[in-house]
Every structure is written in C-alpha cells, then in structure tokens.
Amino acid sequence: MECPFCKRFHDTPKQIVDASKGNVNWQWKHMPLDFHNPAAHKEALAAECIAEQKGNRGFWVFVNDIFHHTQGNGGGVADLASVVTGVGADLDAFRECLGSGKYEDKVEADIQKAKSYGVNGTPATFVVGWHNHTGKSQLLGGAQPAQAIMAVMRKMMIESQQDDSANQ
C-alpha cells in the first residue's frame, strides 16, 4: 500500500464493481515490493489482521485509510494505531495479531502466486473470463483507467458468448 501508482489506481476497482450491478467482483492480493518495505509488508499484514476483526468491509475501509494516510514509497503511516482504531478495531487484539506473524504465509503466498503469473510490478489487474468459467484471463499492468479494464471485460464477454453459441 506504499505504491504511488496503486494509490492512484485504488478507486478504479470500486468504480467498476459499483457500475457492474453485481456482475463483477474484485479480489485483493498483496504484493509489497522490496523497495517499499518494511512499511508495505507491515501494512499487508495489518490489513489481514483488520479483516480478521472487522471482516471484508473493515479490510476495504482500512486499505482506503492507509492509502489516504501513507507517506508512500515506503514512508509508511505516521500513526498506524489511529488508522486501526479509526476503523473500529480493538488495538490490543490488532497488536497481538500483527506481532504473531500469523499472516506472513498468506502474504508470501500472494507474492509467489503473482510472480508465477509474471507480475513484477504494481498495481496489476487480472481480468478473468466472463462468469469465471472460460478459463481465460488477461493481465493488465499499471494503473489502468476504468475504461481500459472495461474494454477488456467487454471483449472477454463477447468472446465467451461466441464460444457459447458455437458450442450449442
């Protein structure tokens, strides 16, 4: 969450999901880059600890608040505790979770999965085939505008419909 391009891109997924009327979902995967660490890695772990306490909505509110408060480029958040309490999380439970390292494996698995798909920078977006059944996906690197992502989605939807018609 230290990536300045991710910060710029952050509102784009919400715009797409909101405009989709329930047809699009967005899944977050962590990929703290080495030159943004240790702040980016700590924020990834922190987001998971918030999700444990506050659920999916709490996770997204926290991520939004981190993007709002971070100095960026590895500078971190000056007062992480205030961001934590600002989303209504219990600070002691959060500190215990963060100190336990219980989400280290999850964050590392996200990093390794991204690398296995050829992702080497952030943000990165995978558009997965229409209704997730085509098996097709396309990687879009960088802070793409909503229109570019929507164009790929439309193309995949049309291809899926053509494939369905051909198979009938």
Locate the predicted segments by residue.
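C-terminal cap of thioredoxin/glutaredoxin-like
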Residues: 11-17, 81-168
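Structural alpha/beta surface segment adjacent to cysteine/selenocysteine redox centers
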Residues: 1-85
